[in-house]
Amino acid sequence: MSSLVGFLSLVFAIGINFYLFLSRYIFKFQKQKFNLFIRFSSLLTLLSFFSLMYAYVVSDFSNYNVFQNSHSNKPLIYKISGTWGNHEGSMLLWLSILSIFSFFFSFTKNIDESFQRLTLIIQSLLHILFGLFIVFTSNPFLVNSILVNEGLGLNPILQDPGLAVHPPISVSYTHLTLPTIPQV
């Protein structure tokens, strides 16, 4: 069930961002409505990530990603860090961090409205591209075609406390999209 919730929330977030990207050329939104859509899209993306994390924590082996990268006897810290300890989960983490920065940037009050809108539209384009990449090539919400009672376990190389602190590195790279956009 968490796989379905995660997948659908990711697809809806991509759809909202596609709508926002088109709004630059077709629709003329008010700032409040535009920012509301950005925030809703960000929350849907976070719901998608936390759905995957929930599947890891409860050892939902009906999710193929969880089956491939987790085991019911793993400590909780490795179940949580197993969420981003693989390609699919890491891409979803990156997209979630990008969404968090878009969410907070949409609350910014002391900048030019057209600059803020253009920055968020480019962030929406990044969200669309990464979201489509995740959905079509790196889907972490694939359903396991066979019933299994146990997962294969996390790669032994990744069973390190350093994996648990990996997200700050992703945050440091991802937040650089906001100051880079005005330079483009």
Residue spans for each PLM region:
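Short aromatic-rich membrane-water interface segments that cap or initiate transmembrane helices
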Residues: 1-7, 71-90, 152-171
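Central hydrophobic cores of alpha-helical transmembrane segments in multi-pass inner-membrane proteins
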Residues: 12-25, 42-49, 74-78, 94-109, ...
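Membrane-interface helix-loop junction between the first two transmembrane segments
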Residues: 19-36, 61-65
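Membrane-interfacial loop-to-helix junctions in multi-pass inner-membrane proteins
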Residues: 29-45, 104-128
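Transmembrane alpha-helix boundary signature
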Residues: 50-65, 106-116, 132-145
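Structured, charged N-terminal subsegments at the starts of enzyme catalytic cores
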Residues: 75-77, 96, 101, 120-147, ...
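Conserved small/polar residues in nucleotide/adenosyl-binding loops
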Residues: 174-180
